[in-house]
């Protein structure tokens, strides 16, 4: 089954850092055979508070999604936003 990394941002305080993160994160996604399904874009909050940004990345398997998230490449990218974004990450196995 496929695996998905879902990141829901609660806040972003520095758009320049977000751009820097995006470049580094994209390289890690590509290395681990991921495919962006959702990367920002228009959204409507049908219930609860609206998130400023949501990202969904598909991987060939749940294990590969976890390998991506835990990789040095992605963790280096992830650290770029330390102190500049509050977010929740989940790895989810597909149906």
Predicted segments with their positions:
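C-terminal structural segments of small proteins and small subunits
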Residues: 62-90
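Short S/T/G/P-rich N-terminal loop/turn motif that feeds into the first structured element of a domain
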Residues: 1-53, 60-66, 70, 93-95
